């Protein structure tokens, strides 16, 4: 929501300040998305983990921003869409890439997840993570709060198919799919055409349902106004491509306004079933940055030599 609010002239940062200062601004935008036919509506709590808010100077508003974010979204959804609690990165890297520990990361996200859960979200959307270790901490945090609600996770990648911390799309899928998550995907950074190439690499090795949420092209700022260079018609054009690669959940990230989503929904309504993409049959071992194929189990018999 932050980019959409910025494009509409609301320049306060973080965007979560509007949850308490001008809640109707957030509610109006969310109602527009609901009117376009979204199935899932995320809360305006992207930056609202306590560590990020403290860095931005809003540490004391942590609880208010999160509680208000859920209440506004639930009012906007009005049983027409399911409300998912939106959580994202702290802006720091977990040790050894950064200065805070894995346990600190888990506790940071647990505090946010607990409030979103108390306010009645119907699931969680973890998105725009570039450090897979921090994403794992967020997953653990959510599952400390609830073992039952659906959990969607998205990492963000550069055009070469790696995150800025060096994790490939394949390593991401192999590392995350055995955790207690329901949907694995990618979001942000890339336009649809670039996202497709990365998404296909993910889809080939991932055994979980898939999600894709690209940007509406490239941002353009003329000194007065922010816009993105991909029209809503061009954005919706990629619906078939996403489905062909097996996407079960399709949305948008930066620059995708209600009109982008309306046209995407119309395109999806004409073809609702994701394709069963051919999967890579190999098994893999993966670290944060290295993916290694392994051979299937091989049984070796040994002749018994009785004494």
Predicted segments, located by residue:
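Domain-level signal for soluble alpha/beta catalytic cores
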Residues: 1-307
């Amino acid at each position: 929501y932050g980019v959409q609010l910025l494009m509409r002239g609301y320049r306060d940062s973080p965007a979560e300040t509007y949850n308490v200062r001008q809640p109707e601004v957030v509610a109006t935008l969310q109602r527009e998305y609901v009117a376009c036919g979204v199935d899932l509506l995320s809360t305006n709590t992207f930056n609202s983990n306590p560590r990020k808010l403290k860095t931005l100077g809003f540490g004391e508003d942590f609880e208010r921003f999160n509680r208000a974010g859920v209440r506004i979204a639930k009012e906007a959804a009005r049983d027409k869409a399911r409300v998912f609690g939106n959580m994202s990165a702290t802006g720091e890297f977990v040790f050894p890439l950064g200065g805070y520990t894995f346990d600190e990361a888990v506790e940071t996200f647990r505090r946010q997840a607990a409030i979103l859960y108390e306010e009645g979200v119907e699931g969680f959307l973890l998105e725009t993570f570039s450090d897979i270790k921090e994403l794992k901490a967020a997953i653990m945090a959510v599952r400390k709060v609830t073992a039952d609600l659906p959990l969607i996770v998205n990492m963000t990648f550069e055009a070469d198919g790696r995150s800025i911390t060096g994790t490939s799309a394949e390593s991401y899928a192999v590392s995350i799919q055995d955790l207690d998550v329901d949907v694995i995907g990618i979001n942000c950074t890339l336009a649809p055409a670039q996202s497709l190439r990365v998404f296909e690499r993910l889809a080939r090795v991932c055994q979980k349902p898939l999600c894709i949420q690209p940007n509406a092209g490239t941002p353009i700022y003329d000194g007065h106004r922010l816009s993105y260079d991909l029209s809503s018609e061009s954005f919706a054009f990629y619906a078939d491509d996403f489905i062909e690669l097996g996407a079960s959940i399709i949305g948008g990230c930066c620059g995708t306004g209600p009109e982008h989503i309306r046209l995407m929904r119309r395109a999806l309504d004409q073809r609702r079933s994701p394709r069963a993409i051919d999967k890579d049959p190999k098994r893999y071992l993966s670290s944060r940055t290295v993916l290694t194929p392994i051979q299937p189990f091989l049984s070796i018999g040994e002749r018994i030599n009785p004494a």
